[in-house]
């Protein structure tokens, strides 16, 4: 999720709870897994189902739409942002004490499984805006990892009249940072950035506006990135496609840093010499 600032686009990051089994304590983008309810009757309460299916042509249309619904639901649960429009196609405003309190209750209810996101959207006479989500990346966990994830990353602009905040349950802190500032804080060991988050921030670093970033995302070629895990001299390394030590060392679109070294729970990014291992 992005917003414009005087210093360029800023990205919304949440800090995962320390006790979370996967990436505990790391700063990440809001997100999570697809639930069964994310597949249900989407045409009745969602706009942009055709857009969603077109963005994920490698999946059956129903699964492609469910990925988008899950992204919107997780954004509401973890950041309190609702990508939904009213009958005039205006994004719902969450300003005002009464409105804020009501949607805080809705958020807690969705998070706790008492309500579905569909229930909230239909109760308020809204439509979920799947067309506001732009696919820009596809990551798969290394084959040796005990937890396997196949993750699609989406980009969106924070709607007007909505203020994101972490949920104080799965996430314990949130912040807006420019990509450069987030990377600098990671280098200084102030925050932990997982390799996919670091790589995404590096890709966003050069854009001057959110419109520029969204335009890039809409036209880029989506590559399936599956890092490889390597232990060398007792040091854990994560190698991206394009790194000379990766099984697929040839990737014309490989990011600047293709190698991440884990030291004391912090990932350190390294630019490798792609001509030799």
Kindly label every feature range from the protein language model.
Residues 1-277:
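N-terminal leader/linker segments that precede catalytic domains of diphosphate-processing enzymes
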């Amino acid at each position: 999720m992005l917003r414009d600032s005087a210093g360029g686009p800023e990205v919304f990051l949440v800090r995962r709870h320390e006790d979370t089994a996967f990436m505990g304590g790391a700063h990440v983008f809001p997100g999570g897994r697809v639930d069964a309810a994310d597949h249900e009757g989407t045409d009745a309460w969602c706009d942009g189902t055709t857009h969603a299916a077109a963005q994920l042509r490698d999946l059956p249309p129903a699964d492609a739409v469910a990925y988008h619904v899950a992204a919107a639901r997780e954004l509401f649960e973890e950041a309190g942002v609702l990508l939904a429009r009213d009958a005039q196609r205006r994004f719902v405003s969450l300003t005002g004490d009464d409105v804020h309190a009501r949607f805080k209750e809705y958020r807690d209810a969705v998070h706790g499984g008492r309500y579905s996101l569909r229930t909230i959207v239909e109760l308020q006479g809204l439509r979920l805006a799947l067309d506001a989500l732009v696919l820009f990346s596809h990551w798969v966990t290394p084959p040796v990892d005990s937890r396997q994830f196949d993750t699609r990353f989406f980009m969106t602009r924070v709607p007007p009249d909505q203020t994101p905040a972490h949920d104080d349950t799965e996430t314990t802190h949130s912040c807006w940072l420019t990509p450069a500032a987030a990377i600098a804080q990671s280098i200084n060991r102030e925050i932990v950035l997982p390799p996919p988050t670091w790589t995404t921030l590096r890709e966003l670093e050069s854009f001057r506006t959110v419109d520029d970033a969204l335009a890039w995302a809409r036209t880029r070629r989506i590559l399936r990135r599956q890092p490889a895990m390597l232990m060398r001299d007792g040091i854990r390394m994560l190698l991206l496609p394009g790194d000379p030590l990766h099984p697929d060392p040839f990737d014309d679109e490989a990011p600047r840093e293709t190698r991440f070294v884990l030291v004391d729970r912090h990932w350190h990014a390294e630019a490798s010499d792609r001509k030799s291992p």
